[in-house]
Amino acid sequence: MSLSRPLRLFLLLLPLLGGLLLSMDWAGRQARQQALRAEGEQVRKQLDLYAGSLQTLIERFRSLPAVLALDPDLRAALAGPIDGELQQRLNLKLESINLAARSSTLELLDRTGLAVAASNWNLPTSYVGHNYGFRPYFRQTIAQGSGRFYAVGVISGIPGYFLSHAVRAEDGSFLGAIVVKLEFPDLERQWNQTPDLVLASDAKGIVFLANHAGWRYRELEPLDTVDRFELAETRQYDRQPLTPLRHQTLRSYGEDRRLARVESADGEKDYLWQSLDLPNDGWTLHLLRDTASIQDDVATARLAAAGTWLALVFLGLFLHQRWRIARL
């Protein structure tokens, strides 16, 4: 029984269309893999640069508290009572050192954590007279001789990285601590020059640095009861509401790279998400690159594959027609 003309046409077009779709799918997948691989290498290099600039900034000041802890004036002041005149001399000394070092603030704490002098003594947000014994960096300094802690300033409301070192008497007894605070506005402005999202999160997975304000103070992972209690006790992100950042992994490319779908104020968007641990400070640096350009590469590859397939089909039809004519 002979087939009808429409059916014959359908059976002819079916493998042609199937081949067209398969070639477009294959080309799209190959283009995606190549683009993700190339983008991943670029993202990792970019992230290494950001990590280097952040660590260089911190290392510039990491030794400052240890050096100041040896200052005889500071040691002598903490060893005895501090009157108004001595406190003013200490304030001016710290102000001068802070200006020369280009740190954000310097403060001198006694053995209870009370700020007896500070470089910002003449500002409304002065630390002088406030007790910081509850801050982890002070507790670490008592136990280990030095401490570090990123937090929002309780008085100033300005976030920063606190580095501290113990001030000790000649016999080694603990007298107090000298603390330097670092703020990172210049670093975030540098990050703003890229269209990518650049984030830094702490050990709890809370974003504390970001080149876009709406991404700061976001929870990358759910916080448990212990974490929330500790945050409240230390006032780490004092008066800053923490909101979850909803995201899901679409595909993993090793331990530190993945394709993720992230929900933000602009809606859902897919990112190539690269992470880099900073073990010295217990932080993780993240770079999120929009995959829109990758989608463009995929679409271009699919169109090229479709064009190639159709060209081969027409070439085949042409050769078939020539063969039929030659047989006549």
PLM regions: where:
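Cytoplasm-proximal transmembrane signaling helix
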Residues: T291-L328
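Extracytoplasmic/periplasmic sensor domains and loops in membrane signaling proteins
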Residues: D83-L92, W121-V152, R216-E263
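Extreme N-terminal signal-anchor transmembrane helix of membrane signaling/transducer proteins, especially
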Residues: M1-Q33, R37, A306-L317
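Solvent-exposed, extracytoplasmic
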Residues: Q88-A100, A177-R235
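Extracytoplasmic/periplasmic ligand-binding sensor regions of membrane-associated signaling proteins
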Residues: L99-A100, A118-Q190
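Extracellular/periplasmic juxtamembrane segments that couple receptor/chemosensory ectodomains to their
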Residues: E230-L303
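Amphipathic coiled-coil signal-relay and dimerization helices
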Residues: A76-A77, G113-N120, V207-N211, Q274-S275
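Juxtamembrane extracytoplasmic/periplasmic/luminal helical "stalk" adjacent to the first N-terminal
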Residues: L16-G80, S103, S146
